[in-house]
Amino acid sequence: MVADVRASRRSRASATPAAAPVARARASRVAPALVVVGLAIVLVVAGLAWRAGSTPPIPVASDAPVAPPTASAPQPPVARAAPAPPAWADEASCAGCHAEAARAWRGSHHAKAMMAPSAESVRGAFDGREFRHAGTSTRFFRRDDRWLVRTDGPDGKPGDFEVRWTFGWAPLQQYLLELPGGRLQPLQVAWDAPRARWFHLLPDEKAPPGDVLHWTGRYQNANTMCISCHTTGFEKRYDANADSFASTWRAPNVGCQSCHGPAGRHVDWARAKAGGRELADLPGERRGLAVDFAALGGRGQVEVCAACHSRRTELTASPTPGAPRLDHYLPATLRSGLYHADGQQLDEVFVDGSYRQSRMYRAGVACTDCHAPHSATLSRPGNATCTQCHAPQPDPRFPAAAGAYDTTAHHRHREGSAGAQCVACHMPAKTYMRIQPRPDHSLRVPRPDLSVSIGTPNACTQCHADRPAKWAADAVERWYGPGRRREPHFGEAFAAAREGRPGAAEAVAAIAADAAQPSIVRATALELLRAEPRAGERARLDAARDADPEVRAAAADALESLPAAARVPALVPLLADPLRAVRIAAARALSSVPRERLDPAARAALDAAQAEYVEVQSVSLDNPGARHKLAV
């Protein structure tokens, strides 16, 4: 249900990727007092103070300036030219040439991600019926051509609020109501389309007006959290002085240019070609394409989709489709609270972090190998999606997938039963927003033995809920042999590190250094090492030179807890890294080093990266977390 994930996205906290705006548990809430304190600090320091890190400054062993080796010395900072403004096209212009793609898209969840209210777009019953939750009445009704909701407002008094936009399509639909300051807020009472009923997304909560989890609260704001992945060409346009929004977008849905990029030059090319001439001066690809999927390859395609189908921090105000991901986003790691220790999804993490753990991702399998690109539905029904590759004669691109898998000898379940479905064992679903099951895209082999040892979930007892994990682990051993239990898994080391067990840091450092591990796993290992200043120094230093930018960014953060004499030579070259996420991580990790301990070239590079860090936080001043980061 990839289409559902994007069309139902609710976690868009730029500065704090763990914030989930609509269905977030109270355990992760931020007290309103912290917001006030953070704002006050920012006003005092004007947002320019640099944080000293999680530990006090570590003195450099020598009074001499610390510089990296000559071969790695950064070049003087070069002003980066502002990119040319994107040339957007009218979304309707695409259908003239791409009629079949447009037809498939019109029926997709992407097309219905956000719509103006109308008889066709509103699924909920606005017929005067009333829904009650925790003593609050919410009534849905129409007046003339307006869809209205009567419920408690920010002051706690009942008021009538007009639906400005629908949000999502199936299995649920929410409604955006407008508050002063250009704020669009998703009502927490949503429409359950399959059951034709209203329901509350937080049934166990009573968030009063003024609470950040009340539907009018700051952490329920769709301008900050949601709309960028429900629209095309979103511009948040937050005014920090007025604490207001003037948000705009090119199209109120996930349209062609959300994935293919601004199409103005491509339309110019198409019109010129139709007129019998070519435009030789078009920039970029020969057809004026902003994103050329044929040239991107499997992993490049995943990065385009991951712009929204991921839990991540936004680094720029206007991310460019098809640009290197870590220039515009910092993906969340497999941290506690988001993922189980073995990498299974826990919180709303939106597919990508799971998929990048998988063997399929490493083999180059792209999203469109399983999902039709424009309808976003599965390309084949049921197990046929999997057996196009996992078969005796697989797709020639993936010869390692050869084998007979859709058989009882493999899955050990009755043919045609629920247990015989590939996804039942390899993509167990977790339900979010109360009614939306989302399959885990790590496509893992079930490991009930890990459930026994570290308490993680497993697909077997998700179905056989009346059976213990050991029963399932014993069955797997009988079927596939004892070797399955002896296969090492990073989850064991991560679970030990999360619990602070002796010796865990050494095991985590070994994972960070293991190039065979997925980059998101190695980045998570490096993140865990931050709490262990004496462990894994070699792994951190080596990771700073890794080919993978996600690993380099995590290494920069992990190096912060090392003595300055050790970390500075590794961090200074990262100030000139090609990718923004790495540069600002290095700047943050060097902020506690006295400037006089750096040579002039290193100071200049640090100044440039620190300015970039301020710019990144300024993108998210609507989120108190960004203001807090600037202040400390």
Language-model region placement:
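Ser/Thr/Pro/Gly-rich low-complexity linker/stalk segments immediately outside membranes or between
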Residues: 52-68, 78-83
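Short inter-helical turns and helix N-cap capping residues of alpha-solenoid HEAT/ARM repeat scaffolds
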Residues: 516-518, 547-549, 578-579, 623
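Structural detector for internal amphipathic alpha-helices that build alpha-solenoid repeat scaffolds
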Residues: 488-500, 520-534, 539-542, 550-564, ...
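Hydrophobic alpha-helical membrane-insertion segments, chiefly the h-region
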Residues: 32-51
